[in-house]
Amino acid sequence: MTRQVALDKVRNIGIMAHIDAGKTTTTERILYYTGRLHRMGEVHDGGATMDWMEQEKERGITITSAATTCFWSPKYGNYKGENHRINIIDTPGHVDFTVEVERSLRVLDGAVALFCAVGGVEPQSETVWRQANKYGVPRIAYINKMDRTGADFFDTIKAIRERLNSNPVPLQIPIGEGEIYAGFVDLIRMKGIIFDKEDGSTYEEVEIPHDLENEARTWRINMLEAVSEVDETLLEKYLNGEDITESEVRKVLRQATLNVDIIPVLCGSSFKNKGVQFMLDAVVDYLASPLDDGEVEGHHPRTEEDVVRHPSDDEPFAALAFKIATDPFVGKLTFFRVYSGMLKAGSYVLNSITGKKERVGRVLQMHSNKREDLDAVYAGDIAAAVGLKEVRTGDTLCDEASPVVLEKMVFPEPVIQIAIEPKTKVDSDKLGVSLAKLAEEDPTFRVKTDDETGQTLIAGMGELHLEILVDRLRREFKVEANVGQPQVAYRETIRSKVDFEGKFVRQSGGKGQFGLVNITVEPLEEGKGYEFVDAVKGGVIPREYIPAVNAGIQEAMKDGVVAGYPMQDIKVTLFDGKYHDVDSSEMAFKIAGSIGFKGGARKANPVLLEPIMKVEVVTPEEYLGDVMGDLSGRRGHIEGMGQRAGAQFVGAKVPLSAMFGYSTDLRSMTQGRANYSMEFESYREVPKNIAETLQEKRSSKDAQ
């Protein structure tokens, strides 16, 4: 059994963009040109192949990262005529589904960043760009919708440079914009490409139009200067006025793209079939193969020693599970990226996070929601496994004889929660199982039971996120449920450092209970969560009781001292204590830890925190005053404003608690002509009057 395509001919790419930049349409065109589709689906008629969930077809947005495989042989460039395998992950553009983008980027070798030629760089573009920077993902930019009225290629380039702090280098410039968009000038070959008006998939190569000759020369010089800066040999040739070959330019462009020194920029109109073929050539030419990415580092699950895996079929098997999905026909699907080795269908793998062995029943190559069986997968492949029951997102799958734990994925905490109740007894029986399956698929979706009311609470990244999950309950799991009003996920923290003694003594005949701890409680910087330091010396507390102290503290943190909300960003140092030979126990020290923490937290200037959202509103100018006044009335802090795509935009930081129902209010305020995006920014201290209201609510709840 050998691989079909050499590793250097594989490209694992993501398509990332703001909502409505034309992402799903572009993927459809890629599949059409690479021979995977016979009829192209349009997003606006609900027929797109990659948008396969019912809600996606209805809303015209992509929610889950559908994965698909296709093949492409470039017509131009250094890989001309060589067949390449392209694995594509289509990622959602709505900020509530940022987790899908995050986990896709973790396993990709490159990305195509889509921008709308009219809208330019929009808020989600910035979010996704930051995520791609975090993982060092090489990318090319494709400026789509060049045929739309108001399209501005060069303005979008400027926005990429300024708003994304990147180095965009156009490899093409458009011939016409808006309704007169006809094609582009290829700055590497210095030729014009004119697309057929009726069928954009056919085109002819022409000389550069006279009125564009000077502009094309200027932008070619700009491109040559940019690539020369990253290669000394090329720089020398350029400064000496020597000829630089097309092959040399592409070779250096590739290296500079892989190093994320430059972002090659292309243009087109996917809807009109113009430009996608050349974007595919660029994917092959400039984006990384698994070999370019090189080795991945991890550690041994038992010894914690560093372990390295190279992208080779001969190395031991190592893969990362990056997505769990429920398929109506085959059950649980585990999407994984193979970093080294090979895996045959029917063989066993070790989950190095849980230490459990599981059998991979089938290995599938996915085409959106269709599938084909594979006998084996190899280094660099992206596939889906059937039969893995206990694997979760971010787990490492590996060879039992050579275990490794790859770097885990980190997901943001949910910021909004709602109570959910089944409508009937039948629904009640199914609700728990169905919610557990959804939580397994989505690491930012949490389910818990309120200890006091017994209500089931679901938490997620935004109103749309939870709305779609409740919708999936109804459609996929046939569970009808009522949902309550959204609740904000408040948090608590401390502002001061204090020492405190926690003591638990119980003497009631027979064996007593005794545990005494001395701890320091102090604030940590935002986002650090919780840190426990064992600074006990001289055996004043036996070693076996110290984990119990830590457990008691963590349990106490779940129920804060201000209004009962979870506490975060706190460091606790255990520095002293006492024990009793007979009466001490793990339970006694757990309770002592809890008492000590609660007492210390009350003295350490505790405060209530609320999630603050980064909000951007794009509105016609006549409504600007109303929009700004409304945001200020919601305790919003206006941070910036300006013009974008013929409209005004306002940036603000607003508490989440003030944003519920905002879409309806904005619609009525602007007659439906404005839109907005919102994403979590950080936690901030709640104003005193609101904190008091929340404390009163808590007190009245406790009194009931």
Curated annotation (Swiss-Prot):
One of its GO terms (molecular function) is GTPase activity. GO terms for biological process: ribosome disassembly. Keywords: Cytoplasm, Elongation factor, GTP-binding, Nucleotide-binding, Protein biosynthesis. Residues 8-291 form the tr-type G domain. It holds the Pfam family GTP_EFTU_D2. It is found in: Cytoplasm. Gene3D superfamilies: 3.30.230.10, 3.30.70.240, Elongation Factor G (Translational Gtpase), domain 3, P-loop containing nucleotide triphosphate hydrolases, Translation factors. The keyword Zinc does not apply. Signal peptide: none annotated. GO terms for cellular component: cytoplasm. Belongs to the TRAFAC class translation factor GTPase superfamily. Classic translation factor GTPase family. EF-G/EF-2 subfamily. Catalyzes the GTP-dependent ribosomal translocation step during translation elongation. During this step, the ribosome changes from the pre-translocational (PRE) to the post-translocational (POST) state as the newly formed A-site-bound peptidyl-tRNA and P-site-bound deacylated tRNA move to the P and E sites, respectively. Catalyzes the coordinated movement of the two tRNA molecules, the mRNA and conformational changes in the ribosome. This is Elongation factor G. It comes from Chlorobium phaeovibrioides (strain DSM 265 / 1930).
